[in-house]
C-alpha cells in the first residue's frame, strides 16, 4: 500500500489475476494488495489478516461503534472488512489512481456516512490537531511502490499515530522483517508508544512483520482472550487462535494499562 507526498510522479496502477485472485500492482511486479474475486470480504494475504489482530482487544459487541483509520489503501481488504463489521472507516491514500482502481476492480464503494476516503498525505493527516483521539483502530501500511521501505517512518510520524488513537486504541503496522530498516522502524515505534506497548508477530513466509502498538490498553484475562480468539476464528474465519499463540508470551506479563506519554 502506498501514500505520502513526495516530489515524484505517482506510479501507475496495474491489475493481474491468477487462480481466482485479483492483484494490485504499482508499476512493478510487487503485490500491493489482493482480493479473492468470488469472496471479496475474505482477507487473502496473511499479513493483512494479522493486521486485524486488534479484534482480540475489543468486544465484538462494540465493533460497530469502533472508529477505524487506514493509512494506505492497497486493494481495500481492510476497508471492506471494517465496513462489513459496521465500523466508521476513514482511509487516507495519496494516489488517486489507487482509489479509482479500488472502486473499479476491488469493490470499494463510494463514500457513504460510514466511509470517508481522503486523497492526501498521511503525514499531514496524523498531524492535524482535530484528528487527535479520533481513531480506535489504526492500520498503517505505507511501503513505496517498489516495496523497499516505509515512506513514512519517523518517530514524529509514529507519535502522530499515537496521538491519533483514543485511549484503549491499537495501531497495527506492516514492516518487512528481512529489511535493513526493520530494527530502526521498530525502535521508533517503541520510542513513540513505549517499549511495553509494542508487540510483534513472527515474520510471514514473505517476510512481513506486523507490529501491534497500543495506547493505554488493559489486556483481557487469558481465558477471555481465548474466548475472543475462538469467536473471531469461528465467525470471521481469521486465524485468531494462531495470533494468540504467537502473542501470548509477551502479553501475559504486562496486563496493566500503560502510562500516557507527554505530547511530541
Per-range role (PLM):
Residues 12, 86-88, 112-114, 168, ...:
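A generic structural signal for alpha->beta connector loops
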Residues 9-22, 169-176:
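An acidic intrinsically disordered interaction segment
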Residues 29-33, 143-146, 171:
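A short, flexible beta-alpha/helix-coil linker loop
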Residues 60, 107, 194-195, 237:
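Residue-level recognition of short, structured coil/turn motifs
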Residues 155-222:
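C-terminal substrate-binding/active-site "lid" region of AdoMet-derived donor-dependent transferases
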Residues 4-6, 18, 24, 39-167, ...:
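The AdoMet/dcAdoMet-binding core of the Class I SAM-like
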Residues 1-17, 31-40, 46-49, 57, ...:
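SAM/dcSAM-binding transferase cores
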Amino acid at each position: 500500500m502506498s501514500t505520502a507526498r513526495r516530489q515524484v510522479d505517482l506510479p501507475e496502477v496495474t491489475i493481474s489475476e491468477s487462480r481466482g485472485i485479483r492483484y494490485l500492482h504499482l508499476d512493478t511486479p510487487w503485490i500491493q494488495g489482493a482480493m479473492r474475486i468470488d469472496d471479496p470480504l475474505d482477507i487473502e494475504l496473511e499479513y493483512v489478516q494479522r493486521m486485524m489482530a486488534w479484534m482480540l482487544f475489543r468486544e465484538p459487541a462494540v465493533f460497530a461503534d469502533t472508529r477505524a483509520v487506514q493509512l494506505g489503501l492497497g486493494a481495500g481488504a481492510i476497508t471492506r472488512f471494517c465496513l462489513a463489521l459496521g465500523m466508521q472507516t476513514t482511509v487516507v491514500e495519496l494516489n488517486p489512481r489507487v482509489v479509482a482502481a479500488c472502486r473499479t476492480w476491488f469493490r470499494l464503494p463510494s463514500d457513504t456516512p460510514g466511509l470517508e476516503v481522503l486523497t492526501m498525505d498521511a503525514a499531514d493527516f496524523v498531524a492535524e490537531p482535530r484528528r487527535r483521539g479520533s481513531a480506535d483502530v489504526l492500520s498503517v501500511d505505507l511501503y513505496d511502490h517498489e516495496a523497499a521501505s516505509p515512506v513514512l517512518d519517523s518517530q514524529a510520524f509514529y507519535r502522530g499515530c499515537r496521538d491519533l488513537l483514543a485511549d484503549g486504541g491499537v495501531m497495527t503496522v506492516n514492516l518487512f522483517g528481512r529489511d535493513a530498516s526493520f530494527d530502526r522502524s521498530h525502535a521508533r515505534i517503541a520510542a513513540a508508544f513505549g517499549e511495553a506497548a509494542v508487540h510483534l508477530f513472527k515474520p510471514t513466509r514473505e517476510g512481513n512483520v506486523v507490529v501491534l502498538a497500543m495506547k493505554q490498553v488493559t489486556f483481557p484475562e487469558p481465558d477471555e482472550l481465548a474466548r475472543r480468539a475462538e469467536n473471531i476464528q469461528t465467525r470471521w474465519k481469521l486465524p485468531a487462535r494462531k495470533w494468540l499463540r504467537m502473542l501470548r508470551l509477551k502479553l501475559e506479563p504486562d496486563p496493566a494499562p500503560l502510562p500516557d506519554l507527554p505530547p511530541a
